[in-house]
UniProtKB/Swiss-Prot annotation:
Compartments, record wording: Cytoplasm
Keyword annotations: Aminoacyl-tRNA synthetase, ATP-binding, Cytoplasm, Ligase, Metal-binding, Nucleotide-binding, Protein biosynthesis, RNA-binding, tRNA-binding, Zinc
The protein's name in its UniProt record: Alanine--tRNA ligase
Catalytic activity line of the entry: tRNA(Ala) + L-alanine + ATP = L-alanyl-tRNA(Ala) + AMP + diphosphate
SMART domains on file: tRNA_SAD (SM00863)
Organism: Natranaerobius thermophilus (strain ATCC BAA-1301 / DSM 18059 / JW/NM-WN-LF)
Length: 878
């Protein structure tokens, strides 16, 4: 049975059991900072299990993409470990419980997958008599095929919170897969009894003291590994033989030219590359980019591990993007979004692999030096400081260092590495705090952590309010009052000031009372989701508890609102013009400009930029109303709202609809697109691998930019003595004229050099059986001096050329030696090193060619006069 068919049957089966079948969630968790990537079928559903959110149905079924890396070192070595897999699961949120979960699990296995009932075993938790009785009395599995196991095997819990016993369905693959022990049964470490389905009965809550209480809402969470089921149903020994993975393995075998099954180490490398290709494809496909931390580092680690094993197999060039092609061909039936993002995924992988190839050779060389020194010194452990140097200076992953060190029979001081890393992070943290000049979550600020600050600035730019706190952030003190000239942080409630977040910079303005006035220099959001005002008192004094009026700088905020709406419209236009793979990777919304970072693998062409500008300006001309919709997260997604994975969303969300551009956003926006007036992109740069940056202007700022460009064209036209509409034509004429003159200059230069070469050769000195050319010249730059020296040397069968020149009040030297004299011990680098000392300088180079400089050009002649002695000394000591 094909793997795609197994997946399809599973979802269809539970659809017949009134389950809401949902396509796989992204590998990137939404609003869950506790995990980097989704590693279990239930992980995206946690809010439904905890009751934080209401599920779309009390019954759900999914085939969830998962990534797990704790056992990454085992991937390729064992037949069952993988970083990427699909988890089939059916879930109940307070609906059905043990009986249905067990019956349906057995029904699907026997009737839909046609597994032999005689081969099925069940394991239950030691004390779970209810599950045992259902399996035996109602399903009909005999006592001898039901196993009671302890907490380690059959009780699911993670610290405190919901937990419960579980029951596993196992399949007996036969004695040939076993360990020959008479006690062999489910729970044994051998491969005979394959666990194919885990049914978790979440019925208890565990408190911090370890006490268990029964939950009011009992849930079901099941998981069946798709690839593991395929191994069973396709009757193959490992996941590398199933229909969706074997073609990838065959591709890697062909690419490497290695015969599978002849060398265990090479087989491991082949399997690592095969498995990691699947992981990389899906992780990049869901929007993760390689990085040095977070989920981006997980991706980088997997990709670089595969690349390194390619090198071990003798694959020299980048190779993974072709493997990505194959993974997509195989998996696009179930995941059509991979096809949509094919070129993007391939390019990101290619860029990262190429980057790794350039750095890994240098890192490997240094690591090998460390290992050689350890061997000479009789050491068994690589010091943490050395591993950190590889990581910090050369971008060499710790995991790769660990792997190579272990392969060579050594150990790694990981504690020392961690200490170095922590030291660096602490230094960076302190530097950041010093540069910011304040600690937002100070002890003084903590006094207000339970105080709610209401934001009213969507509708009001002026607000009657009250000061609830004054903080001297420099001394971490709470103040009762503040005087003219002092700078402090102030909390007011309610507040019309928007605190910097979501890329939108904070508001400025003023607050004033009967007793004083303060300029609001900036607004930020602290760790308690409160707007904090950085203010300077300009008149009188302000006291805690004062009634104040808050007034936002109107024009500045209006400009910010226009630019924020423009970022949404730009995001939409990028997806339309460049491709659906484009995702926002960062933004800055300021009053005078906007900046937008997005995922893409190449610079945008001029034509693409024009098309993007046309799309945005078209939306502006339509003058569509900007709609704000407050709704729940699920409905927002049904509206097609774009959610940024890095952002956290509550169940209640705010949707901004600007024509076809629909996004979740908490920022402030224009009321209609026509307010933007004009949109103009003025800069494009690269932020990093796979991330581009556009900077743009709107409204008055865009007009000023175009006016400036027009003035520049006018100035150029005046310089060229032509009309503005003929600037390009006239410039082209000048360029062609310059090219012609450059050719003429080059021709004259060659003629001069020919005469100069002949002149220098005529002044050469015969020493034994070779010629010495040592001369002082004037006003030759380094390039010309090298060129002339090369021409002279090429005229000599055997000889030494040393030329010196005075230029820009400095001395320059170039030395060249023919091959025969190099073999006799003449060394150009040592010659220029000595002559340069005479002029107060230094330098060096190769035996056949070297260059040096000095600060005292008046001693050039003295230096050149010493060349003959140096050459003779070198020959006499050879």
């Amino acid at each position: 049975m094909r793997t795609h068919e197994i997946r399809k049957k599973f979802l269809e089966f539970f659809e017949t059991k009134d389950h809401y079948v949902r396509k796989s969630y992204s590998i990137i968790p939404e609003n869950d900072p506790s995990i980097l990537l989704i590693g279990a079928g239930m992980a995206p559903l946690k809010p439904y299990f905890t009751g934080e959110k209401t599920p779309p149905s009390p019954r759900m079924a999914t085939s969830q993409k998962c990534v797990r890396t704790p056992d990454i070192e085992e991937v390729g070595i064992t037949a069952r470990h993988a970083t990427f897999f699909e988890m089939l699961g059916n879930f109940s949120f307070g609906d059905y419980f043990k009986r249905e979960a067990i019956f349906w699990g057995y029904e699907f296995c026997t009737e839909w997958l046609s597994l032999s009932p005689e081969k099925l075993w069940a394991s239950v938790y030691l004390d779970d008599d209810e599950a045992y009785d259902i399996w035996h009395d109602e399903v009909g599995i005999p006592h001898e095929r039901i196993v009671r196991l302890g907490k380690e095997d059959n009780f699911w819990e993670i610290g405190t919170g919901p937990c419960g016993p579980c029951s596993e369905i196992h399949y007996d693959r036969g004695a040939e897969y076993g360990c020959d022990s008479p006690d062999c049964k489910p729970g044994c470490d051998c491969d005979r009894y394959l666990e194919i389905w885990n049914l978790v009965f979440t019925q208890f809550n565990r408190d911090e003291e370890g006490n268990y209480t029964t939950l009011k809402q009992k849930n079901i969470d099941t998981g069946a590994g798709l690839e593991r089921l395929a191994v069973l149903l396709q009757d193959v020994p490992s996941i590398y033989e199933i229909d969706i993975i074997k073609p990838i393995l065959d591709h890697v075998i062909q690419l490497s030219g290695v015969n599978y099954g002849e060398d265990n180490d090479k087989d491991i490398s082949l399997r690592i590359i095969t498995e990691h290709l699947r992981s990389v494809t899906f992780i990049v496909g869901d929007g993760v980019l390689p990085a040095n931390e977070g989920r981006g580092y997980v991706l980088r680690r997997i990709l670089r591990r595969a690349s390194r094993h390619g090198k071990l197999l003798g694959i020299k060039d980048t190779f993974m993007s072709d493997g990505v092609d194959l993974v997509i061909d195989i998996m696009k039936e179930a995941y059509p979004e991979l096809e949509e993002r094919r070129e993007y995924i391939k390019k990101i992988v290619e860029i990262e692999e190429d980057r790794f190839n350039k750095t890994v050779d240098q890192g490997l060389g240094i690591l090998n030096e460390f290992l050689e020194n350890m061997n000479k010194q009789g050491k068994n452990t690589l010091e943490g400081s050395d591993a950190f140097k590889l990581y910090d200076t050369y971008g060499f992953p710790l995991e790769l260092t660990r792997e190579i060190v272990q392969e060579n029979g050594y150990t790694l001081d990981e504690q020392g590495f961690q200490e170095e890393l922590n030291r660096q992070r602490e230094q960076a943290r302190k530097a950041q705090q010093e540069s910011e000049g304040m600690l937002t979550e100070s002890n003084a600020m903590k006094q207000f952590q339970d105080q709610k600050v209401e934001f009213t600035g969507y509708d009001n730019l002026e607000q009657e309010s009250q000061i609830i706190g004054i903080i001297d952030h420099k001394n971490d003190d709470l103040l009762k009052e503040v005087q003219e000239g002092e700078e402090v942080q102030i909390l007011i409630n309610p507040t019309p000031f928007y605190g910097e977040s979501g890329g939108q910079i904070g508001d400025t303005g003023e607050i004033f009372s009967d007793n004083g006035r303060a300029h609001v220099k900036n607004s930020s959001v602290n760790g308690y989701d409160q707007t904090v005002l950085q203010v300077k008192v300009t008149d009188g004094q302000l006291r805690t508890g004062d009634k104040v009026s808050g007034k936002v700088d109107y024009q500045r905020r209006k400009d910010i609102m226009k630019n924020h709406s423009a970022t949404h419209m730009l995001h939409y236009a990028l997806k339309k013009v460049v491709g659906a793979h484009v995702e926002q990777a960062g933004s800055l919304v300021a009053p005078d400009r906007l900046r937008f970072d997005f995922t893409h693998f190449a610079p945008l062409s001029e034509d693409e930029i024009k098309q993007i500008e046309l799309e945005v300006n078209k939306l502006i001309r339509e003058n569509s109303r900007v709609r704000v919709i407050n709704t729940d997260l699920e409905e927002a997604k049904e509206l097609g709202a774009v959610a940024l994975f890095e952002d956290k969303y509550e169940q209640e969300v705010r949707v901004i609809e600007i024509g076809p551009a629909v996004e979740l956003c908490g920022g402030t926006h224009a009321t209609a697109t026509g307010e933007l007036g004009l949109f103009k992109i003025d800069n494009q740069t690269s932020v990093g691998a796979g991330v581009r940056r556009l900077e743009a202007l709107t409204g008055q700022h865009a007009l000023e930019y175009l006016d400036q460009k027009a003035e520049q064209i006018q100035d150029i036209a005046e310089l060229l003595k032509t009309e503005e509409n003929k600037v390009v034509e006239k410039t082209q004429e000048f360029l062609e004229d310059f090219k012609a003159k450059d050719k003429e200059i080059e021709k004259l230069k060659n003629q001069i050099f020919t005469f100069k070469v002949d002149d220098l050769l005529a002044q050469s000195k015969d020493i034994s059986d070779f010629k010495l050319v040592a001369n002082q010249l004037n006003d030759f730059d380094a390039d010309s001096l090298r060129d002339l020296s090369e021409r002279v040397k090429n005229k000599l069968d055997s000889g030494v050329v040393v030329l010196g020149s005075s230029t820009n009040n400095k001395a320059l030297f170039v030395a060249m030696v023919t091959k025969d004299l190099v073999e006799k011990g003449v060394h150009a680098g040592n010659i220029v090193k000595e002559v340069a000392k005479i002029t107060g300088g230094g330098g060096g180079g190769r035996p056949d060619m070297a260059q040096a400089g000095g600060k005292e050009p008046d001693k050039l002649n003295e230096a050149i006069m010493k060349v003959e002695t140096l050459v003779r000394n070198q020959l006499s000591h050879s």
